[in-house]
Each structure stands twice: as structure tokens, then as C-alpha cells.
């Protein structure tokens, strides 16, 4: 009975955590499902001849492709590779968000900041590089056809880098503010600029050549410039959004020290015992 009760409590804790994640990060979760579904639907309709995929791609005559080109792909392997990368990037970003909420005192406020940063990075990492490409194509008269979800993927990787890097200046400010209070605006600027600096140092540690190869350098069909721009957009947007959102937050280890309480184990145990007591 003891082992059975522990298993039931563990399951209840997981259910409770899933509820909290859904409540706070439903936008992230919905985007991680809806974008791949839209890409698969467009590819299927294109194969069936119902919809011509190029009609949604970015060309000089289709400015709506600045947004819609993200769900258009050039065949199964292009679609599969981008969906795999997008799912992996989204999971990494969500994991970084959840780790951050554990280490930040006001986890609800942190979650709202994360959702805003994710939404901005998702939209702008697709729109800004595509807008630059569209303007250049119209100005030069060149025929350009661009499509794919890869810019969003690299935008999310930039957001991931800034999310991880922002914890370091937040920890430093938390230590400093035990003695002196730092105003909100300088605090936000310090967090944002420090996260950009740390992310840049991380890239140098990895190696700039290796970074460019990861962005597709050497592949004839890869839009390396767009990938770089998307990564930078995600990095900067993430740093700015997190800097302002964390401007009143403090780092804490209290939740880790009271892990059982943070996970709601006792509440889960009470719920399980109540359910068992109602069973005939």
C-alpha cells in the first residue's frame, strides 16, 4: 500500500505540474503544436493540388509571404527537418523558462515575461529578416522565392541563449541589492546588456566558424544571412523583454531548498488520500 500510495502521489504531482505549465505557458504550447500542424496542412494541400504552396511563399509579388512563408516547405525532407528542429528548439526554450521560474522569486510574473519574450521572438524573427529580403527583392527587381520555418527556429535559439544568460546578471543584482537598491530602469538595462554580452562570449567560446556552419553556411540552398538575422533578432528581443520583465525580480534558492513544498507534494498526498477514501 505504501508503494502504491507513493506512485499515486507522484502521478498527482505530475498532473498538478502539468496544470501549472498549461496555465502559465499555454501560448508556447499552442504555438509548438499549431505551427507544425499548419506547415503539414499546407504541404498536404500542395501535394493534393488544392493549394499551391508557392502562393504563400515570399516573392516580390506576395508581401503576405513575410509571415506565411514560415509554413511553406520545399518537400518532405525540408518539412521534416524544420519541424524536428522547431520542436527541439521549443522544448529547450520551455525548459529554460521553467528552470528560470524555479530560480526567480515571483514565478508568475516571470512566466508572463517569458510568454511575451517568446511571442515577440517568434513573430519578429520571421518577419524582420523576411521584410528585409522582400524590400531588397522589390528594389533590385530580382525574382526571389523564400520559404521555411528555419528563421523561427534560429530566432528561438537566440531567445534560448538570452534566457540562459539573463540569470547571471540577475544573480549579481540580487547579491548587490542586499546592500543597496538599484532603480528599475538601470536594472533592466544592466540585465539586458549583460545577457547580450554573455551570449556573445558563449558564441566565441563555441567558435564563430562552427556557429556559421550550424546556421547553414556551405549549404547552397540555405539562407544563411536570414538565419543570422533571425538569431540576432531572437537574442536581442529576448534580452530586451527579459531585462524589463526581470527588472523587479530577484534570484532565490528557497524553492530548491523546499523542493517538496514547491512541488506541492503534501497537497497531492491529501488529494490522493481523499480520492482513496471515497472509493467503495
Annotate each predicted stretch with a short phrase.
Residues 1-21, 71, 175-280:
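C-terminal transmembrane module of polytopic alpha-helical membrane proteins
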Amino acid at each position: 500500500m505504501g508503494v502504491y500510495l507513493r506512485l499515486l502521489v507522484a502521478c498527482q504531482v505530475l498532473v498538478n505540474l502539468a496544470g501549472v505549465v498549461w496555465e502559465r505557458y499555454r501560448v508556447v504550447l499552442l504555438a509548438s503544436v499549431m505551427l507544425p500542424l499548419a506547415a503539414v496542412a499546407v504541404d498536404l494541400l500542395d501535394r493534393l493540388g488544392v493549394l499551391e504552396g508557392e502562393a504563400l511563399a515570399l516573392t516580390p509579388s506576395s508581401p503576405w509571404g513575410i509571415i506565411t512563408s514560415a509554413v511553406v516547405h520545399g518537400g518532405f525532407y525540408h518539412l521534416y527537418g524544420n519541424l524536428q528542429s522547431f520542436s527541439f528548439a521549443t522544448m529547450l526554450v520551455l525548459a529554460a523558462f521553467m528552470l528560470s521560474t524555479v530560480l526567480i522569486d515571483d514565478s508568475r510574473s516571470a512566466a508572463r515575461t517569458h510568454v511575451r519574450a517568446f511571442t515577440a521572438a517568434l513573430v519578429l524573427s520571421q518577419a524582420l529578416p523576411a521584410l528585409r529580403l522582400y524590400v531588397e527583392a522589390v528594389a533590385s527587381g530580382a525574382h526571389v522565392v523564400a520559404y521555411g520555418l528555419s528563421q523561427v527556429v534560429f530566432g528561438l535559439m537566440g531567445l534560448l541563449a538570452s534566457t540562459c544568460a539573463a540569470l547571471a546578471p540577475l544573480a549579481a543584482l540580487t547579491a548587490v541589492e542586499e546592500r543597496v537598491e538599484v532603480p528599475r530602469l538601470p536594472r533592466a538595462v544592466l540585465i539586458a546588456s549583460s545577457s547580450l554580452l554573455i551570449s556573445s562570449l558563449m558564441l566565441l567560446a563555441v567558435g564563430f566558424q562552427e556557429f556559421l556552419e550550424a546556421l547553414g553556411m556551405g549549404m547552397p540552398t540555405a539562407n544563411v544571412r536570414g538565419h543570422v538575422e533571425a538569431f540576432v533578432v531572437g537574442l536581442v528581443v529576448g534580452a530586451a523583454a527579459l531585462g524589463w520583465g526581470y527588472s523587479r525580480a530577484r534570484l532565490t534558492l528557497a524553492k530548491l531548498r523546499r523542493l517538496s513544498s514547491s512541488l506541492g507534494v503534501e497537497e497531492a498526498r491529501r488529494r490522493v488520500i481523499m480520492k482513496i477514501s471515497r472509493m467503495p
